[in-house]
């Protein structure tokens, strides 16, 4: 009986993710539509861990394209932020940037902070040279 009650208590404390099934897929949305869902994620999942899990689950099934982020200029013309295609790294980066944002432009700004090294003045500028190219580069002591 105690196990059953603990199970019920545990399950009732878990966030519900079935709401995600009611949403259109993020890769089918334009920027304005995508922006309209970001505040809903913050309201529905106020806890950061639950929100990032929910957002990550929402992206499952997105078309796969390797090396799909760039600087929009210079050596790599791919977009800085995108939701139409993804690879493993982009999935994580867009999730982290999006769940901390209220709209597309803020998510784009956040991904620059996450995906690019800071210059000597502490500013992250999207250039090929300043991009974190390897996961191991992101590991700080």
Describe each region flagged by the PLM.
Residues 1-7:
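Sec-dependent signal peptide recognition
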Residues 13-141:
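Cysteine-nucleophile amide-bond enzymes
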């Amino acid at each position: 009986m105690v196990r059953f009650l603990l199970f019920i208590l545990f399950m009732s404390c878990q966030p519900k993710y079935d709401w995600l099934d009611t949403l259109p897929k993020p890769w089918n949305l334009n920027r304005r539509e995508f922006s309209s869902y970001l505040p809903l994620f913050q309201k529905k999942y106020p806890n950061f861990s639950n929100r990032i899990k929910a957002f990550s689950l929402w992206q499952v099934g997105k078309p796969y394209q390797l090396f799909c982020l760039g600087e929009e200029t210079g050596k790599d013309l791919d977009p800085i932020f995108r939701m139409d295609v993804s690879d493993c790294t982009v999935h994580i980066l867009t999730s982290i940037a999006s769940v901390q944002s209220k709209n597309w432009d803020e998510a784009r700004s956040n991904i620059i902070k996450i995906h690019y090294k800071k210059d000597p003045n502490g500013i992250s500028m999207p250039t090929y040279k300043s991009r974190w190219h390897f996961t191991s580069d992101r590991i700080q002591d």
